[in-house]
Amino acid sequence: MKKVVILGSTGSIGKNALEVIRKFPDKFKVLGLAAKSSVNILEEQIKEFNPQYVAVFDKKACDELRKKVKNLEILKGNEGICKLAKLKEADIILSAIVGAAGLIPTFEAVKEGKTIGVANKESFVMAGELIKKQGKISGAKIIPVDSEHSAVFQCINGCNKPYIKKIWLTASGGPFRGKKSYEIENVTPQEALNHPKWKMGKRITIDSATLMNKGFEVIEAHYLFDMPAENIGVLIHPQSIIHCLVEFIDGTYLAQMSNPDMKAPIALALSFPERLPEIVPPIDWSITTKLQFEIPDTEVFPCLKLAYEALNAGGSMPAVLNAADEVAVEAFLSGRLKFKEIYKIIKKVMDAHKIVSVSSIEEVLEADSWARKMAKKEIGE
């Protein structure tokens, strides 16, 4: 039986992971749960899964939960979450905290040499090189949870790398696929949150609408699979059935396919190298009769270009990209920024940044902090 720690248990990935665990009580035991501030959800999870360890990032929320749950030590803040990330008795750490907040706990788990299911792509966007180096030192095992990276992981597992020519990551195209630039100038947050295929958290859904999420995934794939930027492509695939294509030097391809459901890559990460039965319904080929592919329009969705630029620039720039995007998306969701202005804010922040090489997490966080302040200044906060 695997002992599982879930960092970000009250979010979309965390809830899906607990659904998988609920279905296979003979295979998994919840050792620890960590959340930012969703006390009511976390309280219900504690009652059902009876973890030994719990951590809450937000001080006020932690104090509130301590009043409700008496028979359990509840750890507080980033320090508490990092303690869960390093638990010696944990068989796998599921890193599912959204945004830059997930970086330090993920890095601590890597330093400890843990097996980590990484759903927090921002960790690799911000500090991919550092995580890779630390992982080689500690012997940490990283299993991707993003559907596309899980797909690549499955396709290239046991494959000789020199035979791989290119990795293609697929994207549904989001709610504005096929639109002209002027048609999405004044879209509302509600329209942008209406994703046609995936049920996800708010930030990742907006990032999917701008294609920035796919840009982040390109950066993540670069570090996970040691592929240069020019060998990682993006295809719009509105059916979201094929999650990746791996192109080989002989002109052949391998694809990974399933109905779009995050429980599939989550279950694989939790159970690897085993597979669990009946996680998602099989594809109904009597209905799925057409699979489309398109090249993304980076004139309409220029955020994808910014991600490639940040990856090629290297150093502190990917961390700046992520931080500026996080601030801009938050401003859009709260009605302080138009949809097309998300790109403009990020571009201004990147243009103003003087790239520095990063050799520590502290330097990554300095770049992150600078970019947040600059983005807020550009927004007028």
Curated annotation (Swiss-Prot):
Pfam families: DXP_redisom_C, DXP_reductoisom, DXPR_C
GO BP: any one term: isopentenyl diphosphate biosynthetic process, methylerythritol 4-phosphate pathway involved in terpenoid biosynthetic process
Pathway: Isoprenoid biosynthesis; isopentenyl diphosphate biosynthesis via DXP pathway; isopentenyl diphosphate from 1-deoxy-D-xylulose 5-phosphate: step 1/6
GO MF entries: 1-deoxy-D-xylulose-5-phosphate reductoisomerase activity; manganese ion binding; NADPH binding
Top-rank lineage group of the source organism: Bacteria
Keyword Aminoacyl-tRNA synthetase recorded: no
Key word Lipoprotein present: no
Residues that coordinate or bind Mn(2+): D146, E148, E217
UniProt cofactor(s): Mg(2+); Mn(2+)
Matches recorded under HAMAP family: DXP_reductoisom (MF_00183)
Similarity field: Belongs to the DXR family.
Protein name: 1-deoxy-D-xylulose 5-phosphate reductoisomerase
Species in which this protein is naturally found: Thermodesulfovibrio yellowstonii (strain ATCC 51303 / DSM 11347 / YP87)
